[in-house]
Regions:
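N-terminal export leaders
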Residues: 1-7
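Sec/Tat signal peptide C-region and signal peptidase I cleavage site
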Residues: 14-20
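N-terminal (or domain-start) structured segment
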Residues: 20-110, 149, 157, 173-202, ...
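Hinge/capping helix and adjacent helix->loop/strand transition within the periplasmic-binding protein
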Residues: 78-84, 91, 99-186, 235, ...
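A ligand-binding cleft/hinge motif common to bilobed small-molecule-binding domains
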Residues: 93-103, 162, 167-171, 198-232
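C-terminal lobe and pocket-closing loops
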Residues: 134, 206-280, 289, 306-309
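Extracellular/periplasmic bilobal clamshell ligand-binding domains
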Residues: 295-322
Length: 323
């Protein structure tokens, strides 16, 4: 009898943290790989706040900038896999960086566990108001004639804006000097001030400034016009088919995070994107919202691997590598 009691106490002590406390019982840190005010940060705050309500715990934003998101993803990969540190990233941070950075100390596929696919964001071709071009064809002609005078901003090598630039260069035959920033928020401010002249930027970041008349939009890099900006033509409509890029986002946890916690976080993310108020906020920013089936961890993991297979040859062809 005493032996059974002792064994029961031992099992309770071992299982106590897992079964004695419901997850989550404290705030959750959400690592954001870019500066405050950029599109990834905005999405993290919108979705994270609603997920926090669903889970009954606050999401604390941790902006970790540098190396186009690789520093943030490295921090996430090294975090304790207990569900209290997760990260938001996108096509650039969690796919393209794996093809660009030769000396990453972690594996984007094997060291991070997908939680949920989040909305995707088409890109806008935008310039400062001082660029004298009325449409895409005039813009391309201007860029070719002034390649040595024009500079464009990105959120760093491998960022969504950098991916857009590579597709833009390939589809238009243009080239110009690239200026890396620690996020597109600061870059678009320099675009407004004409410190840089062009960006291929996520619509959620640029569209408010286009609407305010602070910058000019020429095309959206999608198959169809964006419902949030139906007056902006697609790149194909503007005369440049083949420039189609959407920056999808997602949530990840460190490898080793228990599956029941992954599923709990996924359910909270799905609930957040079903909320009509949240959907409207994201759609007003030009975001395309995935279905609950697309958001599931296993479906998202398969999609991430397929995207890596798609983009690695493109990156290799462009010769973009960072030691």
């Amino acid at each position: 009898m005493l032996r059974r009691v002792a064994l029961g106490l031992l099992m309770a002590a071992v299982a106590g943290p897992a079964f004695g406390q419901a997850y989550p019982n404290k705030p959750i840190q959400l690592i954001v790989p870019f500066a405050a005010g950029g599109p990834t940060d905005v999405m993290a705050r919108i979705v994270g706040e609603r997920m926090g309500k669903e889970l009954g715990q606050q999401f604390i934003i941790d902006n970790v900038t540098g190396a186009a998101g690789s520093i943030a993803m490295g921090k996430l990969a090294r975090s304790t896999p207990d569900g209290y540190t997760i990260g938001i990233g996108h096509l650039g941070t969690n796919v393209v960086n794996g093809a660009i950075y030769k000396n990453l100390t972690f594996d984007l596929i094997n060291d991070l566990v997908p939680i949920a696919l989040l909305p995707s964001n088409p890109l806008l071709v935008v310039t400062s108001n001082q660029v004298p071009a009325k449409d895409m064809k005039e813009l391309v002609a201007y860029l070719k004639a002034n390649a040595d005078k024009v500079s464009g901003g990105t959120a760093g090598m491998g960022s969504g804006s950098h991916i857009g630039v590579l597709a833009f260069f390939d589809g238009t035959g243009t080239n110009y000097q690239l200026v890396p920033y620690r996020g597109t928020g600061p870059a678009v401010q320099d675009l407004i001030a004409n410190q840089i002249q062009i960006m291929i930027d996520q619509s959620s970041n640029s569209l408010p400034h286009v609407r305010a008349g602070k910058i000019r939009a020429y095309a959206v890099t999608a198959k169809q016009r964006n419902a949030a900006a139906p007056d902006i033509p697609t790149t194909a409509e503007a005369g440049f088919p083949g420039i189609e890029v959407a920056i999808w986002h997602g949530l990840w946890a460190p490898k080793g995070t228990p599956r029941d916690i992954i599923d709990r976080l996924n359910a909270a993310a799905v609930a957040a994107l079903k909320d009509p108020e949240i959907r409207k906020k994201l759609e007003d920013l030009g975001q395309d919202i995935p279905t609950p089936q697309q958001m599931q961890p296993d479906a998202f993991a398969a999609y991430q691997k397929a995207e890596f297979a798609k983009w690695k040859p493109i990156i290799d062809k462009a010769g973009v590598k960072i030691e």
